[in-house]
Amino acid sequence: LFKLAASVQVRTLPEISNVPFCFVPGIRFETGGPDNTDMLRGEEAEVFGALDSEDDGKQLFIHFGSHNKIIYVENGSITQAATTLSGELLWAVCNHTILKSSVPRPGTIEWKMDVASVQQGFRTAEQYGLSRALFCARVHQKMHGLTQQQILSQVLGALTYADWQMFRHLFELEYKKVTLYGRQVFTDAFLF
């Protein structure tokens, strides 16, 4: 935290305001080859804001948004992170694929996760991969009359499996607490 605070750049932008602006540079992780690099660009501020000043233990934070991230904190320092594109992928799948007519439009209905459908999407992605799991959601709608909520739940289950594949190595570490925050559709699906 102190290292991050020391790297904050303070600027005055008189054309906007006389109040100083603090720019937080983010955090980079380069722990090996290109597959082991990652970065945080704002989530570190959320994590440090959520940390209990008395807690020096090991924790996981899972941020769900346009990019889903798992962040490992040890003794008040962010030591590892992994990021996926699942939030953007959900938007793309729901707006620019054959599934767009199969899922509810954002804001048109209240989100109600169908646990069995999330589990189905998760299992299908685990067995056949993400692309097939997404297509199977469409097949299930056409052949079995699943509702838009059930189809969206299957899509979220498939994306949750893809995230789990990326995140599970951090769950193998020692930790005392897990904090999930962000988009409700992802937190709901992750907790199934």
Task: Identify the role of each PLM range.
Residues 1, 64-67, 179-184:
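Glycine-rich beta-strand-to-loop/alpha-helix junction loops that act as flexible
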Residues 1-37, 75:
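Short beta-strand-loop/turn "lid" adjacent to the catalytic site in phosphate-handling enzymes
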Residues 11-12, 49-51, 168-169:
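Short, flexible, glycine/charge-rich loop motifs used to bind or transfer phosphoryl groups or to couple energy/partner
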Residues 18, 56-59, 175-177:
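A general structural motif
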Residues 26-60, 64, 69-124:
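Glycine-rich phosphate-binding loop plus the immediately following alpha-helix
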Residues 98-101, 105-192:
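ATP-binding/phosphotransfer module of carbohydrate and carboxylate kinases, centering on a glycine-rich
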